[in-house]
Amino acid sequence: MKVLLADDDKVLTHFLSSGLRAKGVETVVVHDAMQAFMSALRSPPDVIVLDVQMPGGTGIEALKKLKQSAKTSLIPVLVLSGSVEPATSEVVKALGAIEFLLKPVGPDSLYAVLCTILKLPTPLIAPV
């Protein structure tokens, strides 16, 4: 599985990408919305994890571009946000996001959601 992880929080992206790589996931990390769109065009991933609030345009703007481009429109997009406003979830799903997760999220739970999205078997995760 190849995942494009787009979030301006470098500590979070390092944490998530390290955890995903430990599970054998190829992870490409970018830190702004425009980089996310350009990276997906250059080398389409299996799934995109996109933060709502980033520099270089919002994650919502990137999601719109991703869904309008013939090259990226069918790639599943999972959106992360620290916002608990129900409107955020409704907006991103209306724009084509397949899933919406509230931060904080860890690599194990993200991996489980990614496997579900891509219909891959998920290993059992031990409770913490």
Describe the residue ranges of each PLM region.
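The feature encodes the CheY-like receiver
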Residues: 13, 55-56, 73, 85, ...
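Charged docking surfaces used in two-component/phosphorelay signaling
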Residues: 14-22
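Short hydrophobic/Thr-rich beta-strand motif most characteristic of the beta2 strand and flanking loop
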Residues: 24-31, 39
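Residue-level signal for the "D+5" position in two-component response regulator receiver
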Residues: 29, 56-57, 94
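Acidic catalytic/metal-coordinating carboxylates
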Residues: 32-35, 58-64
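Active-site beta3 strand of CheY-like receiver
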Residues: 43-49
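Active-site residues of response regulator receiver
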Residues: 51, 81
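Alpha4 helix (beta4-alpha4-beta5 surface) of REC/receiver domains from two-component response regulators
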Residues: 61, 84-101, 109-112, 116, ...
